[in-house]
């Protein structure tokens, strides 16, 4: 529905979106990472944010599919939070893209992070916090970066590196 798309993509109405353990944790992690890149947060904000969200999820009885998945996710994200270093350079966060396919259909969304490289190219980054993104599946999900690149090309970007 057009109104739901408007609420999601223009108003950023999170109440309009299905809430599950991955959307909640991923959303807050993305927010802190964006804040770090924009100078509004620090690396030290990551782990407390995740711990607070895990406590709230437990209180609300919103659970991971299994305890072993939860334990693995917590271990992986704790390691990430303790080792993450803010990127250096010129960046754009949450860049809107609109891609018109050859058959006339449109895809739209927001790119988590674009790095503007010294040589005039850009690199596209997309944060993934779900345990779904591993092994061979990561290649399939990496196609998302190709769609982002196509959208940026249509927007006028000339040299794009997908990462």
Please place each PLM-identified region on the residue numbering.
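Short coil/turn segments at secondary-structure junctions
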Residues: 13-16, 61-64, 132
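Nuclease catalytic cores
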Residues: 2-41, 94-95
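Hydrophobic (often cysteine-bearing) scaffold residues that line and stabilize catalytic clefts
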Residues: 21, 25, 69, 73, ...
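Conserved aromatic-histidine-acidic binding/catalytic patches
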Residues: 17-21, 65, 136-140
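A residue-level signal for conserved active-site and pocket-lining positions in enzyme catalytic cores
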Residues: 1, 29-30, 113, 148
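Residue-level signal for well-ordered alpha-helical scaffold segments within enzymatic catalytic domains
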Residues: 8, 31, 35, 79, ...
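A non-catalytic, helix-rich entry segment at domain boundaries
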Residues: 28-95, 100
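Mg2+/Mn2+-dependent nuclease catalytic core
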Residues: 91-163
